[in-house]
A protein has these predicted regions:
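Short, compositionally biased
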Residues: 50-66, 122-125
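Structural detector for short beta-strands of small beta-barrel domains
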Residues: 1-8, 58-81, 107-111
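Flexible glycine-rich surface loops and low-complexity tracts that mediate binding to linear polymers
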Residues: 3-4, 34-48, 74, 104-123
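Short aromatic-glycine-enriched beta-strand elements
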Residues: 10-14, 81-86
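Beta-strand/loop nucleic-acid-binding surfaces
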Residues: 18-32, 88-119
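Acidic (E/D-rich), amphipathic helical modules within compact regulatory domains
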Residues: 10-55
Length: 125
């Protein structure tokens, strides 16, 4: 995913992307502010279907930041056990979701990811 880093805070960065704005832990070396980076994004919270992961009625992929929490809306590509593969544009992301067996492919889901449980790792600087 291509992101533009807007701000570097003590614990996390604030970024913007074609999907919206978010906050995450930076898992790379030095960065340039402002700076653009191609990154891998990971959501590492404990997700449980029906408790903090739900179907979405909004058929679009987005990231928004509200009170330090990333709100993710994404399309389900596939499910393998408790691993849900989602897309944000051309980017494919695996998220572990307990009870994922009831989720259907090609539907959109919504979940929250606190900034401290979201990480971005640059592919190159």
């Amino acid at each position: 995913m291509k992101i533009d880093i807007i701000e570097n805070r003590a614990e996390c960065i604030i970024f913007s992307s074609q999907f919206g704005s978010g906050s995450a832990v930076w898992c790379g070396g030095d960065m340039t502010l402002p700076g653009s980076y191609d990154v891998e994004i990971d959501f590492d919270s404990e997700y449980i279907w029906g408790e903090n992961v739900f179907y979405s009625n909004v058929p679009e992929e987005s990231i928004s930041l509200c009170n330090g929490v990333n709100k993710i809306n994404s399309k389900v590509i596939s499910i393998d056990g408790d691993i849900v593969v989602i897309s944000l544009g051309c980017d494919v992301i695996m998220v572990e979701v307990s009870g994922a067996g009831v989720i259907s492919n090609e539907h959109y889901i919504f979940f929250n990811s606190p900034a401290e449980m979201t990480s971005v790792t640059p592919f190159s600087n």
